[in-house]
């Protein structure tokens, strides 16, 4: 005796159920979206490093979430057209995710800094202050970089890096590391304001995949690799 397989019922959302769902979760979704909007709007290194790190975590999580959703769409595609688009989107998302990791690893090899895995930019500005290398992300490689000392506090492009420095500690060169090459900026102007404050302007002078001589005698350290970073 053959048994007849009963097809599983197909569940569909009605308009009333969708409205009910939005009413129940509207407040929570609004709070979440407001939080994400504030983080994305005000998450800058020159304002708050803590908020900026949270912003980077949110941006970083976008990739795996996108890949998961596109794979889910492939498994539960409504029809062949949706399936085709879902497969294309999945392939594109995975390729871009792989490219991101490859570029980040290449930049990490060059700088040794975990900022290399920043999903927002592949530009890392680097300054050697008395043997201590500071590495921070910037959006683009500017033609000039400004380093400011305010009562011993060190700022570069408005980003606070450290304390206990004077204008005499500023190096002759700073660099911006990219995935494929290194940009060198030469100090072109320095102005002292009072006894403990002032600023220096660095101008882009050289671009290439090369190594700068170490500022630490006998260390064998290459400043282009920037291993001693914080």
Curated annotation (Swiss-Prot):
Coiled-coil stretches, from where to where? none
Keyword set, alphabetical order? Glycoprotein, Host Golgi apparatus, Host membrane, Host-virus interaction, Membrane, Transmembrane, Transmembrane helix, Viral envelope protein, Viral immunoevasion, Viral matrix protein, Virion
TM spans (from-to): 25-45, 56-76, 85-105
- Main location, first listed in the record: virion
Task: Indicate whether Membrane appears among the record's keywords.
Answer: yes
Q: Which residues lie on this side of the membrane: Virion surface?
A: 1-24, 77-84
**Which InterPro entries does UniProt cross-reference here?**
M_CoV (IPR002574), M_HCoV-like (IPR044362)
Topology within the bilayer? Multi-pass membrane protein
Cellular component terms per the entry's GO annotation: host cell Golgi membrane; membrane; viral envelope; virion membrane
- Which segments does the topology annotation call Intravirion? 46-55, 106-228
Could you state a single Gene Ontology molecular function term? structural constituent of virion
Q: Where in the cell is it found?
A: Virion membrane; Host Golgi apparatus membrane
Q: How does it assemble?
A: Homomultimer. Interacts with envelope E protein in the budding compartment of the host cell, which is located between endoplasmic reticulum and the Golgi complex. Forms a complex with HE and S proteins. Interacts with nucleocapsid N protein. This interaction probably participates in RNA packaging into the virus.
Q: Which family does it belong to?
A: Belongs to the betacoronaviruses M protein family.
Give the protein's function.
Answer: Component of the viral envelope that plays a central role in virus morphogenesis and assembly via its interactions with other viral proteins.
Please state what the protein is called: Membrane protein
Originating species: Bovine coronavirus (strain LY-138) (BCoV)
Q: Which gene encodes it?
A: M
């Amino acid at each position: 005796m053959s048994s007849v397989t009963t097809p599983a019922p197909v569940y569909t959302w009605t308009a009333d159920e969708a409205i009910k769902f939005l009413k129940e979760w509207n407040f929570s979704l609004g709070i979440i979206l407001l939080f994400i909007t504030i983080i994305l709007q005000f998450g800058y290194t020159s304002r708050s490093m803590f908020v900026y790190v949270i912003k980077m975590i949110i941006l970083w999580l976008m990739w795996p979430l996108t890949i998961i959703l596109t794979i889910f769409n492939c498994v539960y595609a409504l029809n062949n057209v949706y399936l085709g688009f879902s497969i294309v989107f999945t392939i594109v998302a995975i390729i871009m995710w792989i490219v991101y990791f490859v570029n980040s690893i290449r930049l990490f090899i060059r700088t040794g800094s975990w900022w290399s895995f920043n999903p927002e930019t592949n530009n890392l500005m680097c300054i050697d202050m008395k043997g201590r290398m500071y590495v921070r992300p910037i959006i683009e490689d500017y033609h000039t970089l400004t380093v400011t000392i305010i009562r011993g506090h060190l700022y570069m492009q408005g980003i606070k890096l450290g304390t206990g420095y004077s204008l005499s500690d500023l190096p002759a060169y700073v660099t911006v590391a990219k995935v494929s090459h290194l940009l060198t900026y030469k100090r072109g102007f320095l102005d002292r304001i009072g006894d403990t404050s002032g600023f220096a302007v660095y101008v882009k002078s050289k671009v290439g995949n090369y190594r700068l001589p170490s500022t630490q005698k006998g260390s064998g350290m290459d400043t282009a690799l920037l291993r001693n970073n914080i």
